[in-house]
A protein has these predicted regions:
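Helix-start (N-cap) detector for alpha-helical repeat units in TPR-like alpha-solenoids
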Residues: 1, 35-36, 69-70, 102-104, ...
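Terminal, low-structured helical/coil segments at or just beyond the last alpha-helical repeat
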Residues: 1-7, 221, 225-256
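Structural signature of tandem alpha-helical TPR/SEL1-like repeats
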Residues: 14-22, 48-60, 82-94, 116-128, ...
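Short, charge-rich amphipathic alpha-helical segments embedded
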Residues: 26-47
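Structural marker of alpha-solenoid helical repeat scaffolds
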Residues: 30, 64, 98-99, 132, ...
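Canonical tetratricopeptide repeat
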Residues: 40-43, 47, 74, 108, ...
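Alpha-helical adaptor scaffolds
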Residues: 111, 138-141, 145-154, 158-192
Length: 256
């Protein structure tokens, strides 16, 4: 039987999904209670965009083995990608109940809560993740995002700064940190982190406009002009480019 499973898995790895579906069904003829095979079969169906069969076989997998963490993750992902956040949440909540020590499920549940703007619920799950994994920097980043959305800018800054101790290669991290400093009216630190975002990725368009605006607000007109001009060199809508060019001209007039 192991040979049949290996064959089905090999077909799947080769992206021969329809053939792998047939092969998994052949296994189930003699192993009708194999939860892992049902899970793999469901994944294969999801790869050919057969939502109905994928849902059916993920559900069957969990009926046979309520402790199969990957099936909860896969089924919730199926619902999430279809836009059914309520079912994604329900699946992960059940998985979290069955597997209270599985922090991967807890973290995924937090992220679905974030997408559904259930901020307080997300905080509960993220804090649970961080209690068990105090160096989970993705969870710190997500918690920073939630704090920002709730207007807790000090909390957002604290969480994002924690992540920067571990990662210095993410323009989005520095951009998020800069936004939090800006919202907290700490303009110098906001500028510093927008510039760090650009240093990591000099094609990150949004940071150029943001830092230019802050330079302008600080009356650093030469720097504002420099970054606005850099911004207009990117592929941005013509209307936006014309608007920024007019702003540059007004700044130059103000300089005299």
């Amino acid at each position: 039987m192991s040979e049949k499973i290996d064959k089905a898995m090999q077909l799947f790895k080769e992206s021969r999904y329809k053939e792998s579906i047939d092969a998994f069904h052949a296994v189930l003829e003699t192993e009708p209670d194999n939860a892992d095979v049902y899970n793999n079969l469901a994944v294969a169906y999801s790869c050919v965009a057969d939502f109905s069969h994928a849902e059916t076989y993920f559900t069957k997998s969990l009926e046979l083995d309520p402790q199969l963490a990957q099936a909860y993750i896969n089924l919730s992902d199926l619902y999430y990608k279809s836009g059914d956040l309520a079912s994604a949440v329900g699946t992960l909540q059940r998985g979290s109940y069955e597997l209270p020590d599985n922090l991967a499920i807890a973290h995924l549940l937090a992220r679905v809560y974030i997408d559904d703007q259930r901020w307080e619920d997300a905080i509960v799950e993220l804090e649970r993740v961080l209690d068990g994994e105090p160096e989970n920097y993705d969870a710190f980043y997500d918690l920073g995002h939630v704090c920002f959305e709730l207007g807790d800018y000090d909390g957002a800054i604290s969480n994002f700064e924690t992540v920067t101790e571990y990662r210095q290669d993410s323009e989005l991290l520095y951009y998020s940190l800069a936004q939090a400093y800006e919202a907290n009216n700490e303009i110098d630190k906001a500028i510093s982190n927008y510039l760090k975002s650009i240093a990591v990725n000099d094609k990150f368009t949004l940071a150029y406009k943001k830092v230019a605006i802050l330079f302008m607000a600080r009356n650093d007109f030469d720097d504002a002009i420099e970054y606005f001009e850099e911004y207009t060199n990117f592929e941005i809508p013509q209307e936006e480019k014309e608007s920024v060019n007019k702003l540059i001209e007004r700044i130059k007039l103000k300089q005299g």
